[in-house]
């Protein structure tokens, strides 16, 4: 005696869930959250005067820069803030597959990554004081948004 057994499984709900998961990577909601988190982390870096990625405080002013600031009435003050132009210049952008943060200020890069005494057009021995980045709070906001979006997609 033989027994043939067939099981039919309706996979439409599974296919719909997979299709909905695919939309998670194609919408702009997550990159928008990422851009906002980058901006918030950067704003906090200026407040804390610390690298947003590591939390390490920025190097203090050089003696010559401190003297210049004192002579011109800019002490006390924040390390990367003279008039606030750099902090105000921060912009973000995002799209389906990216989130960006930056500044159009010509001096933005040297403050982020530092400079060397032999750099052209003149000596630029400036220590790196990273201000753009992603702190732990921003990272958590992004992960929470991803979890929420994926969870919503799977409930479909």
Curated annotation (Swiss-Prot):
Keywords: Host cytoplasm, Late protein, Viral capsid assembly, Viral release from host cell, Virion. Its main location: virion. InterPro entries: Phage_virion_morphogenesis. The keyword Heme does not apply. Disulfide bonds: none annotated. Induction: Expressed in the late phase of the viral replicative cycle. Expression of late genes is activated by the viral late transcription activator C. It is found in: Virion; Host cytoplasm. GO terms for cellular component: host cell cytoplasm; virion component. Signal peptide: none annotated. The keyword Ribonucleoprotein does not apply. Involved in capsid assembly. This is Putative capsid assembly protein G. It comes from Escherichia phage Mu. The lineage of its organism: Viruses, Duplodnaviria, Heunggongvirae, Uroviricota, Caudoviricetes.
